[in-house]
Amino acid sequence: MDLSALRVEEVQNVINAMQKILECPICLELIKEPVSTKCDHIFCKFCMLKLLNQKKGPSQCPLCKNDITKRSLQESTRFSQLVEELLKIICAFQLDTGLEYANSYNFAKKENNSPEHLKDEVSIIQSMGYRNRAKRLLQSEPENPSLQETSLSVQLSNLGTVRTLRTKQRIQPQKKSVYIELGSDSSEDTVNKATYCSVGDQELLQITPQGTRDEISLDSAKKAACEFSETDVTNTEHHQPSNNDLNTTEKRATERHPEKYQGSSVSNLHVEPCGTNTHASSLQHENSSLLLTKDRMNVEKAEFCNKSKQPGLARSQHNRWAGSKETCNDRRTPSTEKKVDLNADPLCERKEWNKQKLPCSENPRDTEDVPWITLNSSIQKVNEWFSRSDELLGSDDSHDGGSESNAKVADVLDVLNEVDEYSGSSEKIDLLASDPHEALICKSERVHSKSVESNTEDKIFGKTYRRKASLPNLSHVTENLIIGAFVTEPQIIQERPLTNKLKRKRRATSGLHPEDFIKKADLAVQKTPEMINQGTNQMEQNGQVMNITNSGHENKTKGDSIQNEKNPNPIESLEKESAFKTKAEPISSSISNMELELNIHNSKAPKKNRLRRKSSTRHIHALELVVSRNLSPPNCTELQIDSCSSSEEIKKKKYNQMPVRHSRNLQLMEDKEPATGVKKSNKPNEQTSKRHDSDTFPELKLTNAPGSFTNCSNTSELKEFVNPSLPREEKEEKLETVKVSNNAEDPKDLMLSGERVLQTERSVESSSISLVPGTDYGTQESISLLEVSTLGKAKTEPNKCVSQCAAFENPKGLIHGCSKDTRNDTEGFKYPLGHEVNHSRETSIEMEESELDAQYLQNTFKVSKRQSFALFSNPGNPEEECATFSAHCRSLKKQSPKVTFEREQKEQNQGKNESNIKPVQTVNITAGFPVVCQKDKPVDYAKCSIKGGSRFCLSSQFRGNETGLITPNKHGLLQNPYHIPPLFPIKSFVKTKCKKNLLEENFEEHSMSPEREMGNENIPSTVSTISRNNIRENVFKEASSSNINEVGSSTNEVGSSINEVGSSDENIQAELGRNRGPKLNAMLRLGVLQPEVYKQSLPGSNCKHPEIKKQEYEEVVQTVNTDFSPCLISDNLEQPMGSSHASQVCSETPDDLLDDGEIKEDTSFAENDIKESSAVFSKSVQRGELSRSPSPFTHTHLAQGYRRGAKKLESSEENLSSEDEELPCFQHLLFGKVSNIPSQSTRHSTVATECLSKNTEENLLSLKNSLNDCSNQVILAKASQEHHLSEETKCSASLFSSQCSELEDLTANTNTQDPFLIGSSKQMRHQSESQGVGLSDKELVSDDEERGTGLEENNQEEQSMDSNLGEAASGCESETSVSEDCSGLSSQSDILTTQQRDTMQDNLIKLQQEMAELEAVLEQHGSQPSNSYPSIISDSSALEDLQNPEQSTSEKAVLTSQKSSEYPISQNPEGLSADKFEVSADSSTSKNKEPGVERSSPSKCPSLDDRWYMHSCSGSLQNRNYPSQEELIKVVDVEEQQLEESGPHDLTETSYLPRQDLEGTPYLESGISLFSDDPESDPSEDKAPESAHVGNIPSSTSALKVPQLKVAESAQSPAAAHTTNTAGYNAMEESVSREKPELTASTERVNKRMSMVVSGLTPEEFMLVYKFARKHHITLTNLITEETTHVVMKTDAEFVCERTLKYFLGIAGGKWVVSYFWVTQSIKERKMLNEHDFEVRGDVVNGRNHQGPKRARESQDRKIFRGLEICCYGPFTNMPTDQLEWMVQLCGASVVKELSSFTLGTGVHPIVVVQPDAWTEDNGFHAIGQMCEAPVVTREWVLDSVALYQCQELDTYLIPQIPHSHY
């Protein structure tokens, strides 16, 4: 301890590195009895035997997968020598430093696994106070194990330690003495005590210093991997000096009593199972203490065993320890059997214990029996050992006798007392007595926490003893552990039969002593698999039961059991269990502590454990189902996977948790990106096929993660579970408490039935998706691989098409979806998963994801690239897929339309929707399932409807493509996303799916409304199509901007883990939805998928109930949707038709398909028109109809022309910079604004540009989709896109330029927000949102308003914008991309990452140049409203002509013709910019309305307006999103342009009116409304500011006012948005422009990326904030700056905080000074809540409710120090002088550096500020007044004035000045 921490750390690092090199890849422990394989890989002999015994026939090398046989194993003496030397070094290190190397090592490892968590723990837990605090918590919580665990977990970051802590802390009074004794490590007694105490306690202590939480984890890890090191160090440190002979004796004892040792291990194990639950249940506090002591002893013993395993040191240290522990072991040996028996009973009892908190009575006996036998034995042993330290072997008999004599708790206490006495009496006895007790207790506790872990230690000990009896011990221990774990689980499980079986097995295991175990290794292993199977079954139930009972604890047990199950191989299982326990314990604690858990999940260990745990639990289910198929193989596979993972495990070896975690880590790591690759690689044995599948389809990787399909199922579930497992485990435990209770028993059945269902479903899906595989995946090999991999996978693969996640989740489906029965459970899981995972993982994983995202994204991109390419081939099969999907959907649908459909689709879509559903379900079970249903329903609907049929095919194709794309991406991305990055890919996948699902969900919700019936067919198909397109684009964009978005979105989405991760869109949705609500999320998703749908629903829905949305989304959406649902539907229908067609066209859809699609689309347009016309939403509908009416022709022409044009545009856009031209201008703006997102913007711009090329093609689609995405814009887009299409068909440039304009705007927006696509989609989304409210205004105002109102909308929009930036861009881009070309997307996702990056960069440059040109044009037109608009019109037509003259011509020709028919006026405006200009001139109101008009004009002049709308929206959005320069510039430009272009806009309105006339009264109405609103726009403007402020409400209000149609339209159709928005928005926009400063400010605020600093938060809390910030695209900085917008303070429930520098600076700067609860509540509600409700109200010094922050924020124009000259003189503590000066400057004072610099004059009041207590000279500050004529006040005057934001009177702060003479 004397050594400098750095030096010690360096040495430790070196030792760690050496240790890592010498670790067994399987057990991640130092290699014991190293054996080498033919492939020259070194493993522990025991591990290899365990591996070889795990399955019959040749096993595979975990590292290289070469076949291994026992005969091929050769002992490697050189490694054993190295290990011995390393142990000696570690021992020496421990002795020299007084540090337990193993602990720190373990800690380091664990820290690596859960760095944040452990580090936090270390920093926090290293203090005894904290430990005591934890102890106190534990003691206070012990009655409620789960609560204890939870609280402890919460308190203790290292949840792994929590249990041990609880137990240990209960024991800690005793341990205190130990700790005290530990303090005297140097003395031999102390060393012995310390050995015992030190080893036991020091493990605890040092672990505790490292983190009480780490204690268990460390102990476990210590046991697992570092145990030998740590224990060796500790033991060596403490024990080696004391008893070297004892070491020998112990070794001998170990040799002699491997059984006993194992018995003790088993006992411990059994005690552990008993104790685990007992502990979890809070065995009696006495028992807990005893158990803790025993655990410690076990730990020590384990450590000793570890050391024993470890050659040299192990022997020397372990000789002593072995003697002690052998004595303990001997003591325990009988008790082992008894314990085994006892444990069998106690396990059952312990089940009850878990259920009963005071089960100690039962269990204590059993536990006591086990520990007791051990305790008595240990006492006797201690006595004997006391007499003969070296003859510990003899005392084994005593221990046996003692063990057999089951003492009672009192006895245990006595034993403990005796142990304490012995500890006091003799080191050896202390070691033994304490060791048995502590080892037992620790072990029990660990066993409780980590039954397997202790056993792993024992196993390790066994391994250590393996030289003599280590392998037998290990095997025995392993089996015991496995059995014990299983027993523990089964017991916990309430499956007493199994428990009995386990008991029998345990007895057998007990009977299997180390020697026996070697011989019976196969038996043990076989039994272990059986037990594993039983345990699996039990554990499945148990896991659920455990989840129910003790989420954390039982999860641990479950994890252990699961791990055992997963790792049939004893060693692997043991080590994995040990690691798993380490993780499982932390995990269970983690589960208890969701946030901590999240942190822990960030740590990756707990999460993985949890993942595995739940995976295991589910895994068991899956194993049950698959167990019959794959249970043993999965175990073997898992072991192989572990073996395979060994390299990873080696990596993870760092974390001793890694062993168990390894499987878990494999899964979890698969879940998590880094581990995913390696572990997947490592899992290749079983997962090789899976991996192939995975590679082809990441989902398979996800599935692979489980290690077997069974595992996959479980892993899927587990992952599904795991991600949510943190939160979900909590919730799920709660949810599952019921569900698991049911499912605990059902899981197998559910799994079985589920699997059968899945099989059936898969059969259905296979049949329906058998086409899909090919269709869905160009790479059918993936499917075959999947199919080859596992039935479930194969089934899943087909499902993959339907829902790749389904494959993943079909295993889950087997568990989750398959068991529709389980679906409740699944729902529970999914919900927790979606909610909790989204929420928890979002918090936790987000960090990990940020790190993992990049790699994972890369991986997913790689995968998705392949998959995307695979998707590329899908277009040919869309109809198949469509039909199949449709058939499947129909079959699903035919079943319970919603429930069955939900279920089947859930299962089917479970892959997709399950991810989605998880998030979606999280958002909306019904919605989620409807999403599922809808997902298939859309296809079904599409299929049902003629247009649905063709479009379905198209849609299906898109769907297939999208699904394929998304599915591959989803799986490529999602699978990994399911892992950590999978969140991101899941984002795209879920985004797609969730989008689709949410869209469809919304549609289902909508379809709940009339529109649902009408629109669902269309919408779902559209959704599917758009969804797919969007997904495709999302995938593309996700791929392209995946890193950016993923980092941003994924991070953000990670926040909403699944939801957000679920989809980029969902991220938006999640963010928006979190901000707005899940429904909004759905809508956002819809918006992304079908922004029109989304927007139509969103604008109305959003506008109406951005906040309501979540809760009222169904109602409101239904109402709003009812209002605009037709629009949605029509848009969707239209969009699916046009979009689908266009998308299909873009996406390589054959012309016939397009024609059919177009025809059908036209038909469907007619139908849609009819439907929509008939629909109440005739505005939207009519508008859509008008759009559509011409649209069918236009669409036909457009679709065909669009095909040509789009493809033309594609090539042209790639080369064309017409859009690029426009993009650059915005991009300049963007770059100005989005300088912080330049790479994104650039990349997105590039992507956008690239996408634009796609988008040009796709722009029709994507603009249709995007525009359609913007419901208004959708309609506008329809109109305008039909304009565009017609124009674009007429003039590709038109589309391009209109789209370009739009795209430019989009791009600008996209640039501002993301690629223009984001801008487009987001803009559109925002437009549609804003269109309900006025995009700019709504966005800005809405953002403002929302920020003010609830930040929901603001956040939604902001997030939406931000999310949308990433996700809208993703959505739009992806939409566009997908629309344009599924294959394009596929290739683009590849290309995006490579060529497109370059292309996009080039395009960006071009765009910038063109933007400059555009700006010049805009400026020219900016001088003239008409010209300005013409510039926009140029953008639309002029730009079409200018940018795409050739295209413009052709497009314009078509445009003209089509436009004439479609939008005569619109055509005129578009065709004739003059008209527009005239109109522009006509309405100057439009000026004010400009944004609105622009928005409305987009509605009116779709291409023109869309362009401009996009443009202005872009401006607005840009402004909104990035209120920075671009916003200002844009706002100014846009407003100028708007003002100048207001005429054009008005004309647009005018033109739009005719169009409306053409389209119908609603349009006229909306047009009139627009017009009347235009004129009203002034009044409206008046209310527009309101609207602007009310943002969504205006839209809603306007929508409600201009209502119904208007709302529908404003929400749905640009017209309404026009009318409403024009009235409201134009007004709003005008108000925006009028309020432009405010708007700018608010826009800046809203659009300006929020920047947060935190103050007073713990690392765990900071991590939550970090994840929250990532989720919501908020910049999180360490220091407060001018850009900072929010200061997050740690407050109490009354929002009272401590005063910190950031607090003062936040108030002085008028920042939002909000409570940390704002973050936590926002995370809980999955949306950014309004800061108003969480603003800090006071502080502990100035008052608890002085409202200073609010006063400051609202009084920035009234600076409190205005007119003051302040000199901050002299030293100041706690804050730099410059910060103090900045503070007073922010408050309006002028700062003077020197006293002599005061300005003498009137109006200026000098003040000198000093801090007297900072002065070293007492009187120095008293003479300051002599140097200047200024009052001298204390710094408190400044601080109080700032805190209260009221200039305080100087009197009370004046410092009396001493006369100069005194000075």
Swiss-Prot record:
Stretches the record annotates as Interaction with PALB2: 1397-1424
Pfam family, one: zf-C3HC4
GO BP term (any one): fatty acid biosynthetic process
Polar residues bias: start-end ranges: 705-716, 1373-1395, 1444-1470, 1610-1624
Cross-link (Glycyl lysine isopeptide (Lys-Gly) (interchain with G-Cter in SUMO2)): 109, 301, 339, 443, 459, 519, 583, 654, 734, 739, 918, 987, 1079
Keywords in alphabetical order: Acetylation, Activator, Cell cycle, Chromosome, Cytoplasm, DNA damage, DNA recombination, DNA repair, DNA-binding, Fatty acid biosynthesis, Fatty acid metabolism, Isopeptide bond, Lipid biosynthesis, Lipid metabolism, Metal-binding, Nucleus, Phosphoprotein, Repeat, Transcription, Transcription regulation, Transferase, Tumor suppressor, Ubl conjugation, Ubl conjugation pathway, Zinc, Zinc-finger
Domains (record comment): The BRCT domains recognize and bind phosphorylated pSXXF motif on proteins. The interaction with the phosphorylated pSXXF motif of ABRAXAS1, recruits BRCA1 at DNA damage sites. The RING-type zinc finger domain interacts with BAP1.
Domain BRCT, first and last residues per copy: 1642-1736, 1756-1855
SMART domains in alphabetical order: BRCT, RING
Maturation and modification: Phosphorylated in response to IR, UV, and various stimuli that cause checkpoint activation, probably by ATM or ATR. Phosphorylation at Ser-988 by CHEK2 regulates mitotic spindle assembly. Phosphorylation by AURKA regulates centrosomal microtubule nucleation. Autoubiquitinated, undergoes 'Lys-6'-linked polyubiquitination. 'Lys-6'-linked polyubiquitination does not promote degradation.
Zinc finger regions, RING-type: 24-65
Residues bearing the modification N-acetylmethionine: 1
Protein name: Breast cancer type 1 susceptibility protein homolog
Subcellular location: Nucleus; Chromosome; Cytoplasm
Subunit annotation: Heterodimer with BARD1. Part of the BRCA1-associated genome surveillance complex (BASC), which contains BRCA1, MSH2, MSH6, MLH1, ATM, BLM, PMS2 and the MRE11-RAD50-NBN protein (MRN) complex. This association could be a dynamic process changing throughout the cell cycle and within subnuclear domains. Component of the BRCA1-A complex, at least composed of BRCA1, BARD1, UIMC1/RAP80, ABRAXAS1, BRCC3/BRCC36, BABAM2 and BABAM1/NBA1. Interacts (via the BRCT domains) with ABRAXAS1 (phosphorylated form); this is important for recruitment to sites of DNA damage.
Gene name, Swiss-Prot/TrEMBL: BRCA1
Listed EC numbers: 2.3.2.27
Reaction catalysed by this enzyme: S-ubiquitinyl-[E2 ubiquitin-conjugating enzyme]-L-cysteine + [acceptor protein]-L-lysine = [E2 ubiquitin-conjugating enzyme]-L-cysteine + N(6)-ubiquitinyl-[acceptor protein]-L-lysine
Class of enzymatic activity (EC top level): transferase
SUPFAM superfamilies on file: BRCT domain, RING/U-box
Organism encoding this protein: Pan troglodytes
Role played: E3 ubiquitin-protein ligase that specifically mediates the formation of 'Lys-6'-linked polyubiquitin chains and plays a central role in DNA repair by facilitating cellular responses to DNA damage. It is unclear whether it also mediates the formation of other types of polyubiquitin chains. The BRCA1-BARD1 heterodimer coordinates a diverse range of cellular pathways such as DNA damage repair, ubiquitination and transcriptional regulation to maintain genomic stability. Regulates centrosomal microtubule nucleation.
Modified residues (Phosphoserine): 114, 395, 398, 423, 434, 551, 694, 708, 725, 753, 840, 988, 1009, 1143, 1189, 1191, 1211, 1217-1218, 1280, 1328, 1336, 1342, 1387, 1423, 1457, 1524, 1542
Coiled-coil ranges (or none): none
